[in-house]
Amino acid sequence: MSGGLRSGIGGLIPHHVGNETLVKLWDTASKRAGKADPAERRANRAAFRNHVDRIRESRGLIEDQPCYGDMRYGSVSMAYAGCEIIAVFNALSFLTGKMPRLDRLIEAFGKDGVSFKGRFGTAPLAAVRFLRRLGFSAEPVFLREDMEALAASCRALILVYYNDGDDIGAMVHTIFISKENGRLTAHNAGMGGMAGPRARDLAELIGKLAGGNAREIMLIGIEKRS
């Protein structure tokens, strides 16, 4: 995308639409009812089985979204638009120690969250609703200072960010972040199937995402309710 477009049309949303406003608009444009096609459900279930061994090798976490072109989400593939669902999958796996069924998550977000038939992925607030229905505490925040405070106190996080804070045309990505021994690790962040990058705090981690061009939109802190 040209520099002129980056600073003009491409920069309009990142520079002039607030994070919380953007997320709420995204949610309004997303689906909250629907019935999954039985044949698609069966195909996704069969396809997921082919990924299970590789997920187990990655500590129960999905790090390789581009490999999921065999699973459908709306009118597109999980390789194209599955990052929000994969972030939820990784959060559940990390917090419970049990691998969830990705095909069932696809079905759930197809009923509440899928945006423009999957072409815009999943509305992040649908992830908040889903996690709360499962009994987790899920707190969304939109300002950098609130995000840094949340990241300091929470061991499981979902981050939504612009791949380029000056260009909406570079799209948005969503990742799970784990915290162990005081260090943050990003998952499914485009590291060639590996976990990472890693950092001491959220600001440092964001600075390492998307070639240093990332800009935060929303952070969800997830905890088990006592």
Q: Language model features by range: what are they?
A:
Residues 1-116:
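Active-site-adjacent structural segments surrounding the nucleophilic cysteine of cysteine proteases
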Residues 84-87, 123-127, 143, 147:
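Stable alpha-helical elements in mature extracytoplasmic
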Residues 85, 120-124, 199, 213:
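A structural signal for well-ordered alpha-helical scaffolds and beta->alpha junctions
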Residues 114-140:
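Mid-length scaffold segments of soluble, non-membrane domains
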Residues 139-186:
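Active-site-adjacent substructure of cysteine-protease-like catalytic cores
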